[in-house]
């Protein structure tokens, strides 16, 4: 038995010496400059590490904002990194593409998280019930539970961010600048007012204006349907906006063919208010008229149904926009009707602003609304819409949206994410910046084409 143990030990020792010698020999044969790098070639996956994005080590974001970058490699399942907004740094505008001030993007500042707001805001959006109880009973109820469960079918590269975070605002401005978007149309409620799922956001406007100005962007206002909106309080709110923000260099003014430089206001759900009430504000003889006053502007109505165009004309609006990103959902959002709407606007001296979106999916908050989902088809849906818009030779184009995550219309960067209960949609096989890049391409194309037919080539006034 002792001889057997001794023999075993000798054999084992010789085997270890052999393995050690083999490894040393291989090491000597391997080139000194060789490097294995990240396992599985992760350096070849652009989705995992967007270019020019700096990751800070300090725990600025909640642990919950960790984004799981899923790959189809089993060993990497569940791998995650915490993504922070890039640090504010000196901006070299020469390295960024030229702006197109005739391209506007709808922007939302209603998001919040515990770090900046003490709680999640909008990311925890409730699941909305269908109006028919017989249908509603077939779908889940309750609220989303961030950070892993948010009210969106996509997941932001910045995580469940706060719109109050200055670094987030700066990142958004840089993304829009990279897409050649010249103007952001800021969703706006009066001070101390908000949508039913949000908080007041007017106090953010100064920061948004400052950050926009840093990148030479302009800011216009997308006035939401706040409670009891009418001619009187609209007059007060227009006055408030112009008095408080009108002197900021980032405040947007549109130079008309007549040479007037006027603020622009998009009016969401304008059809809710009767034409007679709008006429009080928007016609020269109206009791609350802004016409010819320091608070005059270009007021753009939302057209949903075809009949709305006559109400819009009677109301005294200066133009129409179509907002919705779902082709075929409404008369206004249907591409096939845009040439007719453009002709109507031209005949009545109004501005036509078609709205184009990259897709639509709101089933995270309206699970019963699958019929209005529009697949992105790797950017093809977006490009078809942009092409249709350019064919009308519009004065302006609006993008729905930069960051309306609930309805899946965002062009902001999104990343892959998978949880135990949810697999979020993403932009693969392309990079998170896909829709910014598409926007830039078409913005540049639009800028060149517009020079051949438009009479108002001036830049917006500062």
Swiss-Prot record:
According to its UniProt record, this protein's enzyme class is hydrolase
Ranges in the topological domain labelled Lumenal: 31-462
- Cytoplasmic side, ranges: 1-9
CC annotations in GO: Golgi membrane
Please indicate if the UniProt record lists Membrane as a keyword. Answer: yes
Membrane-spanning parts:
10-30
- Stored InterPro entries: Glyco_Hydrolase_99
* Catalytic function, reaction form: N-{alpha-Glc-(1->3)-alpha-Man-(1->2)-alpha-Man-(1->2)-alpha-Man-(1->3)-[alpha-Man-(1->2)-alpha-Man-(1->3)-[alpha-Man-(1->2)-alpha-Man-(1->6)]-alpha-Man-(1->6)]-beta-Man-(1->4)-beta-GlcNAc-(1->4)-beta-GlcNAc}-L-asparaginyl-[protein] + H2O = alpha-D-glucosyl-(1->3)-D-mannopyranose + N(4)-{alpha-D-Man-(1->2)-alpha-D-Man-(1->3)-[alpha-D-Man-(1->2)-alpha-D-Man-(1->3)-[alpha-D-Man-(1->2)-alpha-D-Man-(1->6)]-alpha-D-Man-(1->6)]-beta-D-Man-(1->4)-beta-D-GlaNAc-(1->4)-beta-D-GlcNAc}-L-asparaginyl-[protein] (N-glucan mannose isomer 8A1,2,3B1,2)
Q: How is it modified after translation?
A: Undergoes proteolytic cleavage in the C-terminal region.
Give tissue specificity per the record.
Highly expressed in the liver and kidney.
**Keywords, in A-Z order:** Golgi apparatus, Hydrolase, Membrane, Signal-anchor, Transmembrane, Transmembrane helix
MF terms from GO for this chain are:
alpha-mannosidase activity; glycoprotein endo-alpha-1,2-mannosidase activity
Topology of the protein relative to the lipid bilayer: Single-pass type II membrane protein
Similarity annotation? Belongs to the glycosyl hydrolase 99 family.
What is the protein named?
A: Glycoprotein endo-alpha-1,2-mannosidase
Q: Which organism is it from?
A: Rattus norvegicus
């Amino acid at each position: 038995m002792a001889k057997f143990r001794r023999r075993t030990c000798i054999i084992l020792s010789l085997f270890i010496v052999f393995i050690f010698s083999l490894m040393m020999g291989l090491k000597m044969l391997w080139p000194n400059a060789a490097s294995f790098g990240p396992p599985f070639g992760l350096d070849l996956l652009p989705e995992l590490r967007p270019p020019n994005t700096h990751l800070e080590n300090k725990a600025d974001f909640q642990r919950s904002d960790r984004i799981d970058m899923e790959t189809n490699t089993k060993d990497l399942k569940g791998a995650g990194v915490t993504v922070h907004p890039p640090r504010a740094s000196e901006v070299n505008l020469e390295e960024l593409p030229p702006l197109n001030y005739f391209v506007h993007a709808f922007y939302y500042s209603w998001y919040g998280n515990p770090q900046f707001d003490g709680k999640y805001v909008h990311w925890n959006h409730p699941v909305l019930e269908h109006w028919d109880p017989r249908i509603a009973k077939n779908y889940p109820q309750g609220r989303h539970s961030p950070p892993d469960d948010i009210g969106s079918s996509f997941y932001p590269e910045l995580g469940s961010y706060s719109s109050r975070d200055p670094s987030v605002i700066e990142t958004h401005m840089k993304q829009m600048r990279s897409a050649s978007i010249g103007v952001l149309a800021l969703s706006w409620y009066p001070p101390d007012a908000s949508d039913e799922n949000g908080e007041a956001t007017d106090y953010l406007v100064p920061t948004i204006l400052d950050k926009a100005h840093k990148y030479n962007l302009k800011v216009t206002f997308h006035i939401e349907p706040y409670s009891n909106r009418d001619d009187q309080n609209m007059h007060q709110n227009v006055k408030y906006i112009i008095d408080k923000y009108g002197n900021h260099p980032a405040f947007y003014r549109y130079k008309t063919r007549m040479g007037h430089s006027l603020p622009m206001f998009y009016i969401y759900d304008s059809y809710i208010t009767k034409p007679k009430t709008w006429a009080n504000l928007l016609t020269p003889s109206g009791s609350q008229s802004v016409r010819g006053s320091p608070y005059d502007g270009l007021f753009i109505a939302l057209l949903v149904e075809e009949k709305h165009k006559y109400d819009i004309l009677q109301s005294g609006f200066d133009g129409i926009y179509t907002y919705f990103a779902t082709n075929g959902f409404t008369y206004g959002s249907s591409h096939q009707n845009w040439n007719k709407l453009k002709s109507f606007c031209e005949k009545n001296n109004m501005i036509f602003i078609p709205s184009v979106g990259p897709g639509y999916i709101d089933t995270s908050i309206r699970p019963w609304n699958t019929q209005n989902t529009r697949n992105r088809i790797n950017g093809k849906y977006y490009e078809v819409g942009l092409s249709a818009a350019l064919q009308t030779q519009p004065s302006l184009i609006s993008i729905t949206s930069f960051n309306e995550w609930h309805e899946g219309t965002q062009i902001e960067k999104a990343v892959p994410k998978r949880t135990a209960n949810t697999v979020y949609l993403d932009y693969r096989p392309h990079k998170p910046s896909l829709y910014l890049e598409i926007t830039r391409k078409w913005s540049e194309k639009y800028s060149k084409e517009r020079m051949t037919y438009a009479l108002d080539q001036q830049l917006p006034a500062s």
